[in-house]
Structure formats: C-alpha cells, structure tokens
Amino acid sequence: MKAEQQYIDLFTHYEDLICRHAAGLMNLPRAEALADLERLGFPTVKSEDYKYTDVAQAFAPDYGVNINRLDIPVNPYDVFRCDVPNLSTSLYFVVNDTFYDKMLPKAHLPEGVYAGGMRTFMEKYPEVASRYYGKAAPTGKDGIVALNTMLAQDGFVVYVPEGVVVERPIQLVNIFRSDVDTMANRRILVIMEPRSEAKLLVCDHSIDDVKFLATQVVEIFAGEGAFFDYYDLEESSMSTTRFASVHVKQEAGSNVLVNGITLNNGLTRNNYYIELNGEQAEATLCGMSILDKEQQLDTYSHITHAVPYCTSNELFKNVLDDHAVGAFSGRILVKEDAQKTAAYQTNRNLCATREARMYSKPQLEIYADDVKCSHGMTTGQLDETALFYMQSRGIPRDEARMLLSVASVSYTHLRAHETEL
C-alpha cells in the first residue's frame, strides 16, 4: 500500500468528523485536495526535487491524528521558556495543531490587527478569509500540500489592515505534546494589506520523546508597499519529522524577509515559493542550520520574477557535523517581461567531519535580457590552520571547532534593527 493511502482512507471514513471540528471555510477545498492527493501521491526519490528525502518512509508509520479536537492536558505558558534573551513579543501558542485560546496575551496590537486562531478569524472576517485562504498554496502541484489542506482543521492568522504598523513582533510557538506518536497538520495565514508592517516569529518545540510528524503550510500575502518579516526557528527533537511549505505573493513595492533557522530536528524538508508580482518588490530569503548526529535538512526554493524592476536576495548557510546530511536546491525564474531584475543566490556549507554530507544545486532560469543575476555554491571543511592556531593560543579543540563553525554561518546582511531576532 502506498504511504498516502492510509491518509486518503482516514479522510474518506471520517470526513464528516473532520469537517465538523474545523473552521468552516477550511472545508471548502478539501474535496479538491483529496482528488489532487489521489492523482499526485507523495513525491518520490525519483523526483529530482526530492531525491534526498524519502517522503513515503516518513509518512508510512501509523501516527495518531486528533480529528476529534480532544483537549491536550498542557499549559504552554508553564512548559515553554524562550531561549532568546530580552525578546519582547506578543506570544501565542499552537499545541500540536490546535490554537491555544484558553489564555491569550494582553492586547499589545494596534486597533484592527488580528492575531489568533483560524476559526475566530473566519467568523469575524469571512470575506477576507475566503479571498486569501488556500490561494497561495495550490494543492495541484504538491501531494504534501494537498494532504495538509485535506486534513488541517485549525490554524493561526495574522491580519494587518492598510497603513497599520505593528511595532512589537508577534511570536507563535508550536508545541508538540503527546503520549503517543502523533501527526499535526498546521496552517498559517498572513495577510498584509497595503503599506502595513509586521514581524512574525514562529518557533517549534517538542516536550515529549515520542515521534512527531508535522505538515505545515504558510501563506503570506504582501500588498503594495507592505513590509513583513517571517522568522522560522526549529528547535524540536531528533524524533520529529517536519514538512513545511512557505508560499509568498508580493505586490508592487512590498518588502518581505523569510528567514529559516534549524538548530534541533530529526528530518526537515523546507519548501519556499516566492512570487514577485508587482514592480519594485523586494524579497530576501535566507536560512541557517547547525546540524549534528543524524540530523537531516532538505531545502528547496523557487523564486519567480514575473514583472520588471524587482530584487531578490537568497542566502543559505549550513554547518554539518557527525553524520548529518543537508541538501539545497534553489531555482530563480526570471520571466520574459521581468526586465531590470536583480536576483542573487548563494549557498555556503561547512562539513565539519568526513562523514557529513551536503548536496547543493543552485539554478537560474532567465528569459529576460536586461538583468543582473548570479548564483554560487561552496562546500568546504574546517580550516585546520585556523584550528591549530586557536589551540596554540589555549582554546580547547572542541571549543575552537564550535567557534569556527558558528563564524561560518554568521549573518552580515540581515536588517540591523532586528538584533534580537
């Protein structure tokens, strides 16, 4: 039996129950998502874009799915402590894949701004929700997105009206909590109306030793002149598998930063899709990982320049120790009408041991003739000369290796005012 079949059977048998416990508008695309999953199936290692991640193996185990929305006995405010010092945020929680609404933060948000659960948002702003939900993440191209759309019952929404600036970052913490192996299907929807500004930090944490499988679909809409920063920090566990897709649509003059950081995980696949659909739009896509033991991170990106005078900057850095495995496949597509495009892609990797492995495939696909584009990749090992010099100055070898590793992934181009994030 194919790995996706158990999830198709689950939905077929319990569709009424899934829909009954879900936010209303989330039920509309389920039938199409089911048909797409049946047609596409899961990606296989025969696919060039998934050759380093065995999706079927990851989804094959029998995970529990909380379709009844049973209450999880945990107070996230008691079990979570942020590792980032002096970080002032508006803090929200999702437990597995359910928005935690029993205790909400005191209102630090400007009037008209919404941050909270999908169900309440769809009841409060039904027209806005129907205009955006599912519109950036089509189910007809990726079986995992189709699976998520078919099964997701709740989510988190950030909505910022036109011209509103949210000074304090919004922080969403995804907590895994269960006594049995569990699957979570999460959605995040971000709607930035013209000339609005906000920042969202999403953190993943596991507090139990059982196996977790997460699918996550993030949709970001940036209106004309909007500024939005999205930070994704994964600090889960070696028993956690995550498949995440970030889909961004930008209008004229908008500026979006997407920053993914992986520090602790088991197997992670991150997909990034960015569309620059309005002139003078700017996208910054960057990522950093420090992996060891048997950790695995597979990153795929696709940036589309559809119109003239847009800029994209892409930088991913990885440090791999022990038997860690990393992969990066990035594509920049410059369409024929996208003259005066500036697009840059860089991948830098450090393998700290002979057993660590990194696979990289940067790509440019250009159909316009008046552009400035570049792409490049380097993969190397620790500088033994520098390591010897540091040891000769009294720094223990393990500390010297760590210092050199951290230095190799330091960021020099992030926005200076975001020092805490």
Describe the residue ranges of each PLM region.
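N-terminal amphipathic, basic helical "cap/leader" segment at the start of enzyme domains
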Residues: 1-146, 315
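Short, surface-exposed loop/turn segments at secondary-structure boundaries that line and modulate
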Residues: 42-44, 377, 405-411
